[in-house]
């Protein structure tokens, strides 16, 4: 019995060793197949299995890469600036909806605005509070806006900005107050249509201060060359930061109006230029005008930060850099702003064109802004035209087709700019985010913002 038991053990051991040897050989074949060396100089079942395993591994790797990319985009999206503009047109919609305007129904209306933005993945709302030298809040310096009360100078009976700040923060959304610096009117030069307490009207009434407000192209503007104007604009921004818990101050693209080759050296603030040190030092009127805007922008940032360093200050200029830096319009020294910490915290160019635009393709314009912001001293956001989605608009047939039919156009713009590592986006405008015309494009946009 003892001898028989020993034989069984030996037999079992022999089987185990044999199995280990076969397994070792199989692994050698598999390893050789993976290395591209076929010891049998032919295709074996093990080599085929190894090839299939390698293919599966590659597929898994690709899937992992795709998942990682999606996760990276999602992570990037979570930290992005994702804003939408709420303009004076949107106050018109509020007034049209409610014949009797009250604090309660304004709160209800704006709560709907914020919830719509949140549902799309937005985390910030930019509310217009000074569209035309007026105020959609209680101001010491500017009259009540007609866009909230129906008539300039008329008190609506509640403080819209106070309500908007409360509603935004209650819904975990940040809010910026948006001002237009120089614009007083559009399409009218009749001072009598302005409220009696409008500073533009009061300045115009006195000969000594009349040039603080200029008439040009059928509209009225505050004169960028006047120190009193810069002080007024700065005080208006400072009071917002002092009195309201806003997260940012936002300015848009209304700086100098556009001139022609014929009138550029004669019109608007040319008189102030001729009396300036710039003229005496033989510096051009173009340099002079850029300096006036630069002085205001720097002064405004300093004022904002003096009240609350945590409040951001940014500007959304027109999207075409050539227009901004031309001799005939805007006089926005955008390269200086982008590469210095003295002027703004962010720039958000309005890149309102499609990929098919003949001369200002979205990708090309975006790339140019990225290159201009190479120092990374200022955050770069991209403004996107939701208002064009679903509409037959554009400079050529291809672009019109793109905006009208490509429901992924907004999504593609975000994806393109995101791959280029811009810091965020702003979408114009609230009304278009909820319109039927742009609904399909907005639904696609939502997939890359949520």
Give the residues covered by each predicted segment.
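The substrate-binding groove and active-site-proximal loops of carbohydrate-active enzymes
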Residues: 89-104, 141-158, 215-231, 281-293, ...
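Active-site-adjacent "subsite" loops/lids of carbohydrate-active enzymes
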Residues: 76-107, 176-177, 182-243, 400
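Aromatic- and glycine-enriched glycan-recognition loops and surfaces
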Residues: 100-120, 146-171, 235, 291-298
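Substrate-binding cleft of secreted/luminal carbohydrate-active enzymes
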Residues: 335, 339-360, 369-372, 376-450
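Sec-dependent signal peptide cleavage junction
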Residues: 22-39
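Catalytic domains of carbohydrate-active enzymes, especially glycoside hydrolases
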Residues: 108-135, 243-248, 340-347, 420-424
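Aromatic-lined carbohydrate-binding/catalytic grooves of carbohydrate-active enzymes
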Residues: 120-156
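Polysaccharide-binding and catalytic clefts of secreted carbohydrate-active enzymes
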Residues: 200-320, 325-340, 352-353
């Amino acid at each position: 019995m003892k001898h028989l038991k020993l034989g069984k053990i030996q037999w079992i051991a022999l089987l185990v060793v044999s199995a280990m040897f076969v397994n070792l050989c199989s692994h050698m074949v598999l390893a050789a197949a993976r290395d591209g060396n076929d010891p049998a100089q032919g295709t074996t079942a093990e080599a085929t299995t190894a090839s299939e395993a390698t293919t599966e591994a590659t597929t898994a790797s690709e899937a992992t890469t795709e998942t990682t990319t999606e996760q990276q985009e999602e992570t990037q999206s979570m930290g992005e600036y994702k804003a939408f503009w709420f303009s004076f047109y949107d106050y018109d919609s509020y007034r049209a909806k409610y014949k009797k305007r009250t604090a309660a129904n304004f709160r209800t209306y704006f709560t709907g605005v914020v919830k719509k933005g949140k549902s799309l993945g937005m985390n910030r709302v930019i509310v217009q509070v000074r569209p035309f030298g007026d105020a959609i809040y209680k101001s010491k310096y500017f009259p009540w806006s007609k866009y909230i009360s129906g008539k300039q100078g008329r008190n609506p009976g509640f403080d819209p900005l106070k309500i908007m700040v409360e509603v935004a923060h209650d819904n975990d959304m940040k809010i910026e107050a948006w001002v237009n610096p120089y614009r007083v009117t559009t399409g009218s030069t009749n001072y009598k249509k302005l409220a009696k307490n409008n500073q533009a009207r009061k300045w115009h009434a006195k000969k000594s201060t009349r040039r603080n407000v200029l008439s040009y192209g059928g509209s009225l503007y505050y004169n960028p060359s006047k120190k009193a104007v810069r002080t007024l604009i700065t005080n208006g921004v400072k009071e917002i930061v002092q009195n309201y818990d806003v997260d940012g101050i936002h300015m848009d693209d209304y700086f100098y109006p556009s001139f022609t080759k014929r009138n550029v050296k004669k019109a608007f603030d040319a008189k102030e230029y001729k009396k300036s040190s710039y003229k005496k030092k033989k510096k051009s009127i173009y340099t002079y005008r850029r300096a006036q805007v630069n002085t205001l922008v720097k002064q405004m940032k300093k004022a904002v930060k003096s009240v609350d360093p945590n409040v951001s200050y940014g500007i959304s200029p027109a999207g075409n850099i050539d227009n901004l830096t031309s001799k005939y319009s805007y006089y926005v020294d955008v390269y200086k702003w982008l590469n210095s910490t003295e002027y703004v915290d962010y720039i958000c160019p309005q890149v309102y064109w499609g990929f098919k635009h003949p001369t200002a393709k979205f990708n090309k314009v975006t790339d140019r802004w990225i290159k201009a912001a190479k120092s990374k001293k200022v955050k770069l956001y991209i403004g996107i035209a939701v208002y064009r989605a679903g509409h037959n608009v554009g400079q050529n047939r291809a672009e019109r087709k793109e905006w009208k039919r490509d429901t992924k156009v907004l999504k593609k713009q975000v994806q393109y700019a995101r791959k280029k590592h811009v810091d965020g986006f702003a979408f114009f405008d609230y009304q278009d985010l909820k319109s039927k015309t742009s609904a399909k494009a907005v639904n696609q946009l939502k997939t890359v913002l949520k």
